[in-house]
Every structure is written in C-alpha cells, then in structure tokens.
Amino acid sequence: MKTQVVQTALITGGGSGMGRTISLQLCRAGMRVFVADLDLAAAQKTAQAGHGLPGRAEARGVDVSQSTSVASLFSDLRQRTERLDLLVHTAAILGQTVSIEDLDDEQWRRMMSVNLDGAFYCCRQAVRWMKTHRSGRIVLFSSVASLTPTPGALPYSTAKGGVNMMGKTLAQEVAGYNIRVNMIAPGYVDTPMLAGLPEGFPDYILKKTPLKRFGDVEEIAGLVSFLASPAADFFTGQIFSPNGGLVI
C-alpha cells in the first residue's frame, strides 16, 4: 500500500545542525513542521527562519530523555493537527572520549537516556498516532560510529547501534500499518557538533575519508526529503550512511 503524501512533520533536535537544516528544507517543500528541541530558544529561531517559506514551522520544547516530556509534546501536537506523517529524530549528544575503565555509571546512563531511550520514547508515541491513520514515515538518526568500532566512544557507538536495530525491528512490526522506518547513519558532517571532537581528530578523519571532506548538512537534508517522498515508498528497515567512503 502506498503511503499518504507527507504534510505534517516533527523534527527532534531541530534547533541546530542537521535538525535545523532538515526542518527548513521540509518547510521549504510546503510541509507543516514542528521543530522540537531541548533548547526552546534555538527551536524558535529555526521556526522564525521558516517564516516566508511555503510551509509553516512551529517551535516546541522537549527533553527526549524523559518519557513524560515526550508524551506531553505529542499530546500537545495531537490537539493541533489530526495526523503525523513524518517523524525525524535527530536529537542526540556526543559525550566525552573515555575508555571503559574510566567510564562511570552516570556518563553511561546519560548517553543511553538521550541517544537510545529518546529514540524509543519518540517512536512509541509516533507509532501510536500513525497507527490511527494507518500511514507514516519515521527516520531515525544513528551514526557512522554504529557501523564500525570507534575506540573511546563506547557508549555513543552502543547507543547508536541500538537505534539501528530498534529501527529495523520496528520496521517489521509496523509494516502492516503502512508505516516505513529507516535510519540515517551520517559520517562526519560540518555541524557545531564537530567542535566537540577531540583536538586533531577531525584532521585524522579527513585523512581516512576517501572524498577528503566533511559532509554538508544540505546533503543529509536531501536524503531525508527523499525518504519522505513517494519515491521512497518501497524502502523500510534500511540504514543509509552518507560518509564520504569512510565506511564501505
């Protein structure tokens, strides 16, 4: 069965980086976009940047690591629109580079709560809603670090690997409801999060990347637009990794 044309989208982590660019690109395509972020002011700036575009952008605050916050967000959205056609979950944190023997419980739990629990909470609410109109698309952001070992980033890689398997399993569970679930595992993209990498690491990555550059946020947003389009109707449970050839 074909999915409905995407008209309403929720972007988590839409206040900056890839989430911001995706929000504006979808708004440019005429969609109604809810921009959600822990930093409400940043989400509001994204929404303001969408003024004058064919679509409509609205800002919301959310802490994806808290199930009650996510539930409150979806409750609010349900009062404002009849359906949710697209969830794009980009909200995430990087954390510090640390070896397992120096990794404390709080660091581990924080990484899991934002990067894995957050995806689960958002997917659970989205599926409950999408099932009512038997159509929808979910795009979960993992990372190239979920596809290859990244020493020093054990909790991050583990959480993002969990996102991939959650998405694959969910894709099979909800296919009968005409819901598609796909993952994007970006390589190193030119966003503010690059500043959080250890000194010298970006140069190391460039040397290892066959295309010798970082990704551009517009390239990632273009992939999301494709996955939201009728052209991607036969895609579900797949991991797409734009990474410049870093992992093949």
Give a label for each model feature.
Residues K2-F34:
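Canonical Rossmann dinucleotide-binding motif of NAD(H)/NADP(H)-dependent dehydrogenases/reductases
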Residues V98-I100, D104-R109, L194, I205:
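Substrate-binding pocket helix/loop in short-chain dehydrogenase/reductase
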Residues E101, T148-L154, G176-Y177, K212, ...:
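Active-site loop immediately N-terminal to the catalytic Tyr-X3-Lys motif
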Residues F120, R213-P242, V247:
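C-terminal substrate-recognition "lid" of short-chain dehydrogenase/reductases
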Residues C123, A159, G167:
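Active-site helix of classical SDR
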Residues R128, Q172-G176, D233:
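Alpha-helical segment proximal to the catalytic Tyr-Lys
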Residues S143:
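Residue(s) in the substrate-gating loop at a strand-loop-helix junction
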